[in-house]
């Protein structure tokens, strides 16, 4: 798994290039929740979904054979940008890593 760098900022965008595709993840925080959008090769796949701890970001109908992103929270807390890279992390995992746990 590859740990991606989240900034301690409420609104941000980050890019990840695997062997085949370029992903961009946009994170937006409101007073009540954190939302995300995912672009693959500059095409929006997922738009303004609520970010939930310890879940995959790309739903299975959009997932390809090369992996997925996981938003991980040590204490299963709701996403909070002040805890990014402290107790909440974003990872990219290949399908093999996801299958083997």
Task: Tell where the protein language model's regions lie, with residue ranges.
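Surface-exposed molecular-recognition determinants
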Residues: 66-67, 71-89
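Aromatic-residue detector
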Residues: 2, 13, 44, 54, ...
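Intrinsically disordered, low-complexity N-terminal regions enriched in serine/proline/glycine
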Residues: 22, 61, 71, 90-91
């Amino acid at each position: 798994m590859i740990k991606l760098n989240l900034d301690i900022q409420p609104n941000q965008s980050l890019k990840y290039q695997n062997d085949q595709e370029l992903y961009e993840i946009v994170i937006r925080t409101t007073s009540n929740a954190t939302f995300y959008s995912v672009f693959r090769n500059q095409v929006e796949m997922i738009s303004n979904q609520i970010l939930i701890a310890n879940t995959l970001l790309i739903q299975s109908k959009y997932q390809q054979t090369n992996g997925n992103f996981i938003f991980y929270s040590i204490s299963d807390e709701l996403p909070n940008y002040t805890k990014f890279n402290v107790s909440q992390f974003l990872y990219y995992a290949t399908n093999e890593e996801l299958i083997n746990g």
